[in-house]
């Protein structure tokens, strides 16, 4: 169960200004009063995380992997209470949340298997060359170390997979970093249940209590205090551009600046090339609406921009999309605030000069329902009005009608950084696609063809990141095993006796951990 507690290390406490979850499907206030963490809670959690760092960061890979698996087991053990709580607090349906729970525990287990493999250590040996002329070479050995305690901010749109035990937490644990989670106020009961599962896993594995703390709250000062604490060495964040940039500013102004790995804003352009439009315009129109309206459009990979050459084939796409979208029933949005922001964003597009409304979804019945919207404009209007390139979080998208492939390329070149870009194409479009790919690769973290961007697999190869403002640092990803690298840094050991080296660099570990050795 949950009781609205703050979880600092192995303990729990009440305190701070109380707040309640708002159930978006009904607008009702939840019955449990949740405590808001205070500055003293932040300081104690950071002190415990700092105290836990040495033992946790040097934990043997197998023991760390076992901890990740134990977290997964503890989450599964919560049972249906977790799903029912998340349904009430998020308005998301059961099937979606059951799938998200599977993704969350699967992600933890993937990191466990990767930790055991040891490749992430990147153990590298340049053996001594004492007889080299004119100067001998020292014995040099490099291995990755954890950066230190990590602050993680839970996201609103994935109460399980991008929240307390989501990808940021899983990858930080995998890297050997203690974690302090700032819980999201939209789903505090869900967050506390998962936090208690992690707390139980820490105890079951005999780890230092400071490996994990959970700080609920509904004010920005809490997050700012957490990022400003000198014992925190990195930040994982998924949320709005404004929130992410605010945390980046705090982190940059510290005496010791730290990285903020913030996933923020993306409209994920979809380019419909002429061959694809001639081949399957109507089918693409219907499929596009399915992607746009999935989960009320509350995905960071939602297809918020469509770019295509004007003409009869594009008209066929638009007709099919309009028909599908006109019958789309409004869905519950995650919070009243998100719904209000969506309505304001759609209203701004409806009133923008040079923008026409292609279609709207059916009328909403009940509170906090998002009515889907599809708009159209031309490339000149789009380029002249920055508002049209801003993310509207929800089932809203803008079509840009272009007169040439050069205009398509110029439009893409003018975009900000994005998480994804999609090319709908056939073999007949190869020449155009070849021209587009270099431009797209400068703008996005993931390029896909003949699909839709909303699904993000948790794998070794996945990149869920992109240039600013889609993320704070386009060299990283928040999904997949590569996400560990955000919380690791290389350390080189020169002429250090074997017995004093980290285990991965000792002679007994060479073959097991696949150390790389520079040839003479």
Question: Residues of each region from the PLM?
Answer:
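N-terminal Rossmann-like NAD(P)+-binding subdomain of aldehyde/semialdehyde dehydrogenases
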Residues: 1-135
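C-terminal core of ALDH-fold dehydrogenases
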Residues: 365-370, 405-501
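NAD(P)-dependent aldehyde/semialdehyde dehydrogenase
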Residues: 286, 308-419
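Short loop-to-beta-strand entry elements in the cores of soluble alpha/beta enzymes
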Residues: 67, 175-190, 211, 258-274, ...
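Rossmann-like NAD(P) dinucleotide-binding subdomain of oxidoreductase/dehydrogenase enzymes
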Residues: 119-289, 307-314
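Conserved small/polar residues in nucleotide/adenosyl-binding loops
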Residues: 511-520
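Structural signal for hydrophobic packing residues in well-ordered secondary-structure cores
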Residues: 53, 57, 72-79, 83-86, ...
